[in-house]
Amino acid sequence: LFRSKGIYVYERKYGNKSITVLMNGTDKTQTINLTPYKEVLPTTSAHDVLTDQNIDLNKNLTLPGREMLVLEF
């Protein structure tokens, strides 16, 4: 579990699947620099299972307050 400025990031693995969850625990929209989380972000793109969209992990992410991303690799 990583925590920084109200952003929580954790990873779960099962077999050859990996899920990384990013949660904004604050009420404010936050821009997340993903560089510190490269250990749990094994590729440069991921599938967001909540929105069914592909996410580019080469750039910063914006996460609204009290929202989360569930990324599948």
PLM regions: where:
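Carbohydrate-interacting/catalytic domains
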Residues: F2-F73
